[in-house]
Amino acid sequence: MTKTVQLDRRTLLKGALCLAGAALSTQQGFASFLEADGIGSPLAARREGEMDIHHIDTGRGNSTLVVAPDGTTLMIDAGAGTGPAGTMSAARPDESRRPGEWQARYALRHSGSTALDYMVVTHLHTDHLGDVNDRTPLAHDGTYRLTGVSDVDALMPIGTLIDRAWPDYGNTLPPSAPYLTNYLGYLKSRAAAGRTVQKADVGSDQQLALKKHATQYPTFKSRILAASGVVWTGQGHETQRIVPENPPFKAYENVYSIGLRLSYGRFSYYAGGDLSADTSDGRYPWMDTESPVARVAGRTEVAAANHHGYFDACGPEFVRDLDAQVYIIQSWDIGHPGPAQMQRMMGAWQNKATRDVFATGLHPQNALMNRRFSGQLKSQQGHVVVRVAPGGDSYRILVLDSSDERNLITGTFGPYRSRG
């Protein structure tokens, strides 16, 4: 039986006013998020429900700080690389501190926390975990030196460190080197002290779970897509091995990188360390770990360029399958990025960019080599911050000055509407 409800004029007016008020409240909330932080002003503090992703520019390697909607903190890599004179970007802010110290200080300023819930070390290279020499200071227990990841840990204690394979790397360890011995010594010291070190659990959607108010943000999701040559299939917790356990020759460390995807409502973010697609012109298809990871990641709003946009990464499948609106190149070397990679990420097939691409530190000689496209970068220097609105329906990009610790805003972009 259908019940007919008759509404008088007063009831209708009340309803209209309530709807108008709700619409105004929604518009005001969105307008509040859209209020652009002014050029030359400091970055406003993150508000509850927003998600921030900071690509930190030290000129010495990758480091990305993620502050989830509930305040859970994650750092992806803490690089402190070295290179021949003239081939590296200038140290940012300067060389008075080690890169890991700068990264930790940045995270302490912008995370609202004194500790990191998670550190993901994507793979075993200095520009992602830290280099050492005889002058690098020893940790308090004397078992390892402070650099990169261990420098961050000393200033901003890491709750859970996620490594691509710890403690059993099988036959996949890179050639012995001081930095590698130091990093493994650091992990052993952590484990001996009862501090958590985990192997990346490929396919897991729980290894990077929210720590503070998870139930308030049910649309936040994380997924470990790949590690040590194993890639998620896209089904449940199933995985597939891409790099053979006993390849015909020793695989380069980059193909073993951790890949991950974070999502919040309709927003999504991809990071894949130094995953690459170079197969020696088709001779060794298994060396392409980038393409299967991009395929399972699917369309993504913002993506960090694999391997700094270098010549062997960011191939056609990477850009086609991620289909990102924004790409961020964590560049610091004269070779970052390659011309084809820049054109591909920009979608500049008619010489005009159709996607927004940002670089944390474009080397002047690289800008010259890439002059056909470098002028179309949205930024060539500075910390690149993705600020996602509560709920994930939109986001903005803010570029911060990396020449000192004031980190004043030098550019604002967006808002971008998340496509889901």
Kindly give the residue locations of the regions a language model identified.
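Zn-dependent metallo-beta-lactamase
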Residues: 18-25, 29-73, 79-91, 223-231, ...
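Glycine-rich, histidine-containing beta strand-loop boundary motifs that form or position
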Residues: 16, 78, 164-165, 273, ...
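N-terminal secretory signal peptides and thylakoid transit peptides that target proteins
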Residues: 2-20
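Flexible, acidic/histidine-containing loops and adjacent segments that form or flank the divalent-metal
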Residues: 32-51, 58, 106, 112-113, ...
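Catalytic metal-binding/acid-base residues of hydrolase active sites
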Residues: 59, 81, 125-127, 166-167, ...
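Long, structured stretches of catalytic cores involved in phosphate-ester chemistry, encompassing
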Residues: 131, 290-387
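Active-site metal-binding motif and surrounding structural segment of the metallo-beta-lactamase
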Residues: 69-74, 80-162, 293-310, 323-328
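Conserved protein kinase catalytic core
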Residues: 63, 83, 129, 280, ...
